[in-house]
Amino acid sequence: MTQPLVTTTRKGVIPTYPVLLGIVFAICTVGMTLNLVAAIATDVVDEGPRTLQEQLAGVIGFGLGSLAIAALGAWWCSRTGARSRLGAVLFGALCVPTLILFFSGAPGMFGATAAFLAGLTRGRTPSAGVPRVFGIVGLSVAILNVLVTILGVSIAWLGGGSPSAG
């Protein structure tokens, strides 16, 4: 027997899940994609192990894949309270090893999903205990992913080049 999740009219600075996920995707994945396209168009030379075109393919592929996994995972896990708690832990843990895919936005999207499933986004009832801890970790990673992407791209372009995405 499943019980519907109780939602609240929680207000605060943390937006609803679709808005939070959209912000992370737009800034990290779309923003980095546009950054790499601009770098390719302006013939910026990247001395990293991968070409700008390879980095672009990675950002798009991992970004879209992460978006699909995060959205489907949130949909499936949010159907019951037990799944939400388990999903918060799973996505909160998953956002840490995906830090290697930082500029694709993967850790931020998984972190936003952990925060949603832990009830930390607007319109949800917060969980207690371990799911809440993983939700806080996920929310922190999501915020940092956005801020560091903005800062990294800005500093790199002001310094005369494009940041390496991979």
At which residue positions do the language-model features occur?
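Cytosolic juxtamembrane helix and N-cap/initiation of the first transmembrane helix
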Residues: M1-G63, V133-G135
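Cytoplasmic membrane-interface segments at the C-terminal ends of transmembrane helices
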Residues: T9-Y17, A68-A88, A114-V137
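Alpha-helical transmembrane segments of polytopic membrane proteins
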Residues: E54-S66, L101-G111
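Generic alpha-helical transmembrane segments
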Residues: V59-W75, F91-C95
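Juxtamembrane/interfacial segments around transmembrane helices
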Residues: G65-A71, P107-L120, G138-L151
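C-terminal halves and exits of single transmembrane alpha-helices
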Residues: V89-A115
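Juxtamembrane membrane-interface segments at transmembrane alpha-helix termini
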Residues: L99-S104, L120-V133, A142-G152
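Juxtamembrane boundary at the C-terminal end of a transmembrane helix
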Residues: N145-G166
